[in-house]
């Protein structure tokens, strides 16, 4: 069967079993008190567009674990819902409403993945002007895509975050947080969208999930402009301690600057900086009294807060949209400043353009103010020269800056004349001078982002102070300490290397805005003008999964879901009879919801991508700790890295995104699952490569053919008691044990490697050692276990093959295969490895012999040699070993042979030989004679060492346990 035909057949098999699973509702668990439960969740997807294979990696791993736990006898709940709140969906809807061609065409292409009729596509696009229609359309399509990938989801519990019943739940959550004093109101610096005029969170900012946006606190320092009354150029810095080494100011000649009257002074900043200042001081009045280009400032003189006179010079690296758009130069410790100064010194023509005397610039020299052990001279200059940087536009200057700052921050000491700062560490001096500048009104705090950022509608994001902003205060001491302690001591995080990042994120979190004036979502119950933002309303929704289906079953209305209902259901507070009377919810329904929650909670495993560590997962932990009793706190978090394609990050602009819909149409669910699970460890970026995918298709074809042939073919009666039979059964059960352990520890790639690929390699080897008929019989023997063990990763194909075996029950509901530990036999595995090593050794010798021999004697070591190894392992003295063996076995005159064994096993440990019965070794080589002959082209004879010596076979005495000597002739 050709690959294309095989994939078509496989897709039909997948559709068949998806339909059967859905028809029989086999993934809709009920409470079973006598059965252990397992509650696993993955993030509910944001439904503003189709999902791609990067999302698919996370969801597939979640499903593999859900299926595995089900086979292990757990009552598994694996639910799903859809996230629609926030501003991203509204932003898309608005752009479609404005008639933006680019976004309309993109969304038409998305719709066309599911709808083929052009007229229908136009209708759907038109409907997207209502954001809810857009959200619901993609929620339904994601549902389809998840079904097409075979996810074992309980869809009864589905909801979306815009539903009134969910709004009632979030309302209760925020009332609980307020009740505990964790929601506060005040002036707060946030990431703010100039387009929408409101705070924006990570979910609302382009690429913020993979490239986080952080607010940095600059110190804006005032430099008095000579010749002007009460006027200051303001330069912002992250390193105010370097003010002692300032040599000049930098401005961008072509940038626009403004003179602004503010707080009784005139300050000069870039036009872009003024907008930021106005938003960071919203109650202050700013009056523009002058405008100029940067070139008009070049050549002017200023006085620093330390009293030093400095000149203003031109620099192209200055970004008017970064901080104040003015930079003070400290070339001793700032690589950008050092390179710009060196360039300018060589460019007299440029200086002449601005009327600056080149001699003045040539006299400017870096001032060393920080001493770092091992650094002689100016730190920035040394690093720049080592890296070979000569241009202020060299992107490596970013790394050079990091190197200098890192070394100075941890090792640097101030060597300035000022006794107040002399001898301080860089970190101490930084804080001290900052406080002094602010106290003396020689500077102020300026907030800036760590990178350029835009909302999903294209609005520019800045740092702004919101007056009366509602925020969740993650800095509350008891809350933060409880979260850190729980993660550190109780919570399991896999891969374990991310535990530190998780703890760091919890430690770093402080006050975070939790509401805004715009967007889909739940109104803040105590201030309805505000809408709860999308990361804050998605922290404990796992609890809602436990009751969502019951709310629908009992036709409970949103207005009936008063806070006391959730108090009872989730916390056990209140009298259910009184609550029933007050809300009109039947008592039975309340008790059923309480029972359902108590059975399923806590979350046993939360699986997601590493991008969620700094936000969603931190909030997930914090909010559970705040609201629920300890017994209901989540037990485990597991994570995976991202997916790229052919070595490149996937992006719409590159056109290299593979959507989940493409998997269903062009590939296959089981192909995708096997590849995505087996291509990389969880903590490794997975690189989707088509050539590798092609190889996986071949492997699936081979697996199917192996199973089909074993089922369709009758075989004779075999006792399976040969060494090679024992080897295969040992190998299979060992792989099954290792794969089970791998799944228990979330080592998904190892599980796939062992249970799929390594078992097939073992089958190939067994076939080569025996015959096709014997191989078919052996596969029949292990096939049931093999299918069960592979069901989590390739559920459709294994269900199909299971049905070929005449099985009527769903394989997905079977029990995980029993490991036959008695069959695991180190001895036969070592013997088989020794046979393979012997064949390689013979081949290596054959390659250098001419003419080619036709026969081979294989000499198996005498049993006394094994005894020598035993004595070596016990640590016996060499002379004692020689004496004991010589006397016991009558080897007088053959002491050199004993010494040879001792020497060889001292060089290369022979410990494995202790696992081998010498008679079994002899029998195994004899049994393998035909195989060895086939692989080497030689006639094979096997002898005991003593027999070989009697026949005068050369080098017979050189044989060792598991390392037989051989003679070719």
From Swiss-Prot:
Primary location recorded for the protein, binned into one broad class: cytoplasm
Motif 'KMSKS' region per UniProt: ranges: 649-653
Top-level taxon: Archaea
Amino acids binding ATP: 652
Keyword terms, alphabetized: Aminoacyl-tRNA synthetase, ATP-binding, Cytoplasm, Ligase, Nucleotide-binding, Protein biosynthesis
Protein's cellular compartments: Cytoplasm
GO molecular function annotations of the record: aminoacyl-tRNA deacylase activity; ATP binding; leucine-tRNA ligase activity
A GO biological process held by the record: leucyl-tRNA aminoacylation
GO CC terms, sorted: cytoplasm
Record's catalysed reaction(s): tRNA(Leu) + L-leucine + ATP = L-leucyl-tRNA(Leu) + AMP + diphosphate
EC number: 6.1.1.4
CDD domains with a match to the protein in the record: Anticodon_Ia_Leu_AEc
Keyword Protein biosynthesis in record: yes
Motif ('HIGH' region): 45-55
NCBIfam families: leuS_arch, PRK12300.1
Protein family per UniProt: Belongs to the class-I aminoacyl-tRNA synthetase family.
Protein name (database record): Leucine--tRNA ligase
Protein source organism: Staphylothermus marinus (strain ATCC 43588 / DSM 3639 / JCM 9404 / F1)
Species classification: Archaea, Thermoproteota, Thermoprotei, Desulfurococcales, Desulfurococcaceae
